[in-house]
Structure formats: C-alpha cells, structure tokens
Amino acid sequence: MSLDIVILAAGQGTRMRSALPKVLHPVAGNSMLGHVVATARQLQPQGIHVVIGHGAERVRERLAADDLNFVLQAEQLGTGHAVAQALPALSAERVLILYGDVPLIEADTLRRLLAQVGPERLALLTVDLVDPSGYGRIVRDAAGRVVAIVEHKDASPEQRAICEGNTGILAVPGARLADWLGRLSNDNVQGEYYLTDVIAMAVADGLTIATEQPQDAMEVQGANDRLQLAQLERHYQSRVARRLMAQGVTLRDPARFDLRGEVEVGRDVLIDVNVILEGKVIIEDGVEIGPNCTIKDSTLRRGAQVKANSHLEGAELGEGADCGPFARLRPGAVLGAKAHVGNFVELKNAVLGEGAKAGHLSYLGDAEIGARTNIGAGTITCNYDGANKFRTVMGEDVFIGSNSALVAPVELGAGATTGAGSVITEDVPAGNLALGRGRQRNIEGWQRPTKQKK
C-alpha cells in the first residue's frame, strides 16, 4: 500500500529558551527533525511532507531536499490543524503522522505500526508509562477496544490514572483523513484542533483501532527543554555504544563516547575514553584510538593508531600508520602505510608516503612527501605568500634537518638532505645537501650587556 508521511515541525519550543527553532536543536550532531526525516526515508514513502511554522525559513533552509515537501502552518492551532495544511498534497492509501521533536523513533517500530493499517483499520503507537503526566490517555472499553484519546489537560481524575499514553504517532487510511479533519472542533481547554479526536470519529464510523508499542519507551520521548534534549542525547549514545560493542569494538567506557554522524567499524577496534566521531568515519580492523580524540570525516585503515588528544578532519591513515599524541590532521592529510606523525605536528592537504616520519613540532601544508622521508623537528612548509598557496614536493628518502623552513614552491629530489636551521628557497637536486643559513661566527671576549642603574 502506498504511503505519505506527515512530520509536524511547526512548534516554537518556548521552554528551550532559544532563538533556534525547537526541531533544529541537535541530537548526536543532527537536528531532531533531521533524525525523523532520515527514519521516514527508510520507509520509502511516496511523499514526505514537513509542516513548518515557527522559524519556517530556517527549517526549510537546513533540511532542503528534493524529496521533502514543506507546508506552512501560519497559525499554530493544534495538531489536527497542522495535518490539515498538508491535505492537498496527500494521495496515498496510508498516511503516517510523525513529530519533528521525537528523534529516536525506529523504522522497525513504524513498520510494525503500518502493517496494521487498512481501509477500515487505524493504528496508534502507544506506550505504557509509570508516570504518564502530559500524555493523552488511551481510553478503552470493557473489551479492551480503544474508544478515545483524552488529552491530559482535559482528562478526568479516573482517566489520568490510566498508564497507557498516546505518543501522537498514528497511521490512518488516507481516504478517511480529509473527512475526519474537516469535522474537528476546538471546543477544549486549549482551544485547539486535536488530531487525537479523529480516534473517536473512527470508532463512531465503525473502524477498528489497532495499537502497537515501541521496544523502548525512549523511542517516543520528545524534547521540550534542554534537560530532555540532553536525556535524548545520552540515550542515543548508549544505543550506539551497544551496537558498536556488538560489532566487535572495545569501548573503554561506553558512557564517555559520542558519535555525531555515522561510522563503519571493523573488528577488534579499541576506542578509549572521551572520543568523538563526527560526520562519516571509517574504522578498519585493529585500529586503536586513544583518549580525548576528535575524528571527523576520516578513514583509518587496518591497524592504524590515533594517540591521545589528536584531532583529525578529512584525513586518512594508511595501514599501520600512527599519529599523535597531540597531532592535528586537517582536510587532505593522508598518511601512507606505516607513516608516522608525532606530537604537535599539523598537516593540511599533505601526503606522507609509506614509512615517512614527522616526529614533532612541524607544520606541513600543501605538501607531497615521499616514502621513508624524515622530517626533523620544527620543520615548516612556507606555503602562503599572503595571496596564494604553493606546494612543496619531496622525493623518497629525503632527510629534512631540524628547524628547516621550506619556502614553496620548492622541490627536493630523492635522497636530498637539508641542514638544520636552513631556509630552502630553491629546488634541491636528488642526493644533494642543501644549506641555507649564515655561517657561524664565534666572537672572543664578548661582554654581555648589563642593566643600567636607574
């Protein structure tokens, strides 16, 4: 059966106390709405319709995509009114209603819900809670059939004692929706058009009301304030940690690991505490990541090591390569197999060949460095003249003396050597020693200056 999905994302979120629309607040590096959209796509609907209101343009700009239809709710008059704004775009046999501030809902849960929907059958996602305060209550008759949903503010004391709550997520037969929405009334405490009122209409029309529940109640937890947002974050990270450990990853402390994007992992990977992965990260078998590292949009090949306090973005470490501690690899940094980058070394758009080494205190930008080349401490590639960037090229087996400055554009042939403290401004032929510094002079009888008396 065909499917349209409507995502309600028009709320202001006043309790967030933020200029940012509520649905754009992040969980694990993605907006809450972004998570919901990603889950919706897994269901392969014919259309995804996002109802926006507060901060509409910011939401539209952030989530803009060819497969999303944005619908404006100019006035926030309730959930029923919000869905009604999308009606002209709905044509599928089933319509699924989701919420932009409920980011942890799982696609498998929604598939089970949708499996229960038919022309004469509507499906609700409900949840059993110890404290259902704030949730609409699922009212059933003596036979256990759902007959209505009563919002918390409108519920009687007896109804508030019900522990089965309405998550707001429901799937309905598309052919019935327009009629039900057209009959909604705002005669309630809030003065709003409640989507939940369609349940009583469906019962009156003789439809069966099916229910489904999530595996985990946190799937349907929304975020109305910063505390709830933090709770969603920690639950998401806990879920990710369990999945990674099941795939053969050792997390020294699962509570001190954050994924803010997506990761592919091999087996026997070790990740120490306070590691953050962002964007798309690929980690192959046997990789070790030390504590306090941030790795973004990078690939770590088999057996690579990232030592403590290193920051990688847009980088690649070859098999058996290592970097750190305190290394910074910026976009375009590539370490060949068994290459080594040590402490306080920064690479940007630089390639180190197999077995090349830059042990400490260096900046290597816009550089191509051949296999087995050794970069001495304090080496700088001077790649910027104030207007343009230039490349430095070193062949295989080059030896760069400590505290050398290589003024690009410059090329050093295979086996070339620079003396410590040299400023290299011209190409160095293969096998040559280049010295670019003043000759040392020793001055006998030198008297150090003394402080003048005041």
Curated annotation (Swiss-Prot):
<keyword id="KW-0961">Cell wall biogenesis/degradation</keyword>
<dbReference type="GO" id="GO:0009245">
    <property type="term" value="P:lipid A biosynthetic process"/>
</dbReference>
<feature type="binding site">
    <location>
        <position position="330"/>
    </location>
    <ligand>
        <name>UDP-N-acetyl-alpha-D-glucosamine</name>
    </ligand>
</feature>
<feature type="binding site">
    <location>
        <position position="348"/>
    </location>
    <ligand>
        <name>UDP-N-acetyl-alpha-D-glucosamine</name>
    </ligand>
</feature>
<dbReference type="GO" id="GO:0005737">
    <property type="term" value="C:cytoplasm"/>
</dbReference>
<dbReference type="InterPro" id="IPR001451">
    <property type="entry name" value="Hexapep"/>
</dbReference>
<feature type="binding site">
    <location>
        <position position="22"/>
    </location>
    <ligand>
        <name>UDP-N-acetyl-alpha-D-glucosamine</name>
    </ligand>
</feature>
<protein>
    <recommendedName>
        <fullName>Bifunctional protein GlmU</fullName>
        <ecNumber>2.7.7.23</ecNumber>
        <ecNumber>2.3.1.157</ecNumber>
    </recommendedName>
</protein>
<feature type="binding site">
    <location>
        <position position="374"/>
    </location>
    <ligand>
        <name>UDP-N-acetyl-alpha-D-glucosamine</name>
    </ligand>
</feature>
<comment type="function">
    <text>Catalyzes the last two sequential reactions in the de novo biosynthetic pathway for UDP-N-acetylglucosamine (UDP-GlcNAc). The C-terminal domain catalyzes the transfer of acetyl group from acetyl coenzyme A to glucosamine-1-phosphate (GlcN-1-P) to produce N-acetylglucosamine-1-phosphate (GlcNAc-1-P), which is converted into UDP-GlcNAc by the transfer of uridine 5-monophosphate (from uridine 5-triphosphate), a reaction catalyzed by the N-terminal domain.</text>
</comment>
<feature type="binding site">
    <location>
        <position position="136"/>
    </location>
    <ligand>
        <name>UDP-N-acetyl-alpha-D-glucosamine</name>
    </ligand>
</feature>
<feature type="binding site">
    <location>
        <position position="224"/>
    </location>
    <ligand>
        <name>UDP-N-acetyl-alpha-D-glucosamine</name>
    </ligand>
</feature>
<feature type="binding site">
    <location>
        <begin position="8"/>
        <end position="11"/>
    </location>
    <ligand>
        <name>UDP-N-acetyl-alpha-D-glucosamine</name>
    </ligand>
</feature>
<keyword id="KW-0012">Acyltransferase</keyword>
<comment type="pathway">
    <text>Nucleotide-sugar biosynthesis; UDP-N-acetyl-alpha-D-glucosamine biosynthesis; UDP-N-acetyl-alpha-D-glucosamine from N-acetyl-alpha-D-glucosamine 1-phosphate: step 1/1.</text>
</comment>
<feature type="binding site">
    <location>
        <begin position="99"/>
        <end position="101"/>
    </location>
    <ligand>
        <name>UDP-N-acetyl-alpha-D-glucosamine</name>
    </ligand>
</feature>
<dbReference type="InterPro" id="IPR029044">
    <property type="entry name" value="Nucleotide-diphossugar_trans"/>
</dbReference>
<feature type="region of interest" description="Pyrophosphorylase">
    <location>
        <begin position="1"/>
        <end position="226"/>
    </location>
</feature>
<feature type="region of interest" description="N-acetyltransferase">
    <location>
        <begin position="248"/>
        <end position="454"/>
    </location>
</feature>
<feature type="binding site">
    <location>
        <begin position="383"/>
        <end position="384"/>
    </location>
    <ligand>
        <name>acetyl-CoA</name>
    </ligand>
</feature>
<feature type="binding site">
    <location>
        <position position="420"/>
    </location>
    <ligand>
        <name>acetyl-CoA</name>
    </ligand>
</feature>
<dbReference type="GO" id="GO:0000902">
    <property type="term" value="P:cell morphogenesis"/>
</dbReference>
<feature type="binding site">
    <location>
        <begin position="78"/>
        <end position="79"/>
    </location>
    <ligand>
        <name>UDP-N-acetyl-alpha-D-glucosamine</name>
    </ligand>
</feature>
<dbReference type="GO" id="GO:0003977">
    <property type="term" value="F:UDP-N-acetylglucosamine diphosphorylase activity"/>
</dbReference>
<dbReference type="GO" id="GO:0071555">
    <property type="term" value="P:cell wall organization"/>
</dbReference>
<dbReference type="GO" id="GO:0009252">
    <property type="term" value="P:peptidoglycan biosynthetic process"/>
</dbReference>
<dbReference type="InterPro" id="IPR050065">
    <property type="entry name" value="GlmU-like"/>
</dbReference>
<keyword id="KW-0963">Cytoplasm</keyword>
<comment type="similarity">
    <text>In the C-terminal section; belongs to the transferase hexapeptide repeat family.</text>
</comment>
<feature type="region of interest" description="Linker">
    <location>
        <begin position="227"/>
        <end position="247"/>
    </location>
</feature>
<keyword id="KW-0133">Cell shape</keyword>
<feature type="binding site">
    <location>
        <position position="437"/>
    </location>
    <ligand>
        <name>acetyl-CoA</name>
    </ligand>
</feature>
<dbReference type="GO" id="GO:0000287">
    <property type="term" value="F:magnesium ion binding"/>
</dbReference>
<feature type="binding site">
    <location>
        <position position="73"/>
    </location>
    <ligand>
        <name>UDP-N-acetyl-alpha-D-glucosamine</name>
    </ligand>
</feature>
<dbReference type="InterPro" id="IPR025877">
    <property type="entry name" value="MobA-like_NTP_Trfase"/>
</dbReference>
<dbReference type="GO" id="GO:0019134">
    <property type="term" value="F:glucosamine-1-phosphate N-acetyltransferase activity"/>
</dbReference>
<comment type="pathway">
    <text>Nucleotide-sugar biosynthesis; UDP-N-acetyl-alpha-D-glucosamine biosynthesis; N-acetyl-alpha-D-glucosamine 1-phosphate from alpha-D-glucosamine 6-phosphate (route II): step 2/2.</text>
</comment>
<dbReference type="InterPro" id="IPR005882">
    <property type="entry name" value="Bifunctional_GlmU"/>
</dbReference>
<comment type="subunit">
    <text>Homotrimer.</text>
</comment>
<dbReference type="GO" id="GO:0006048">
    <property type="term" value="P:UDP-N-acetylglucosamine biosynthetic process"/>
</dbReference>
<keyword id="KW-0808">Transferase</keyword>
<dbReference type="InterPro" id="IPR038009">
    <property type="entry name" value="GlmU_C_LbH"/>
</dbReference>
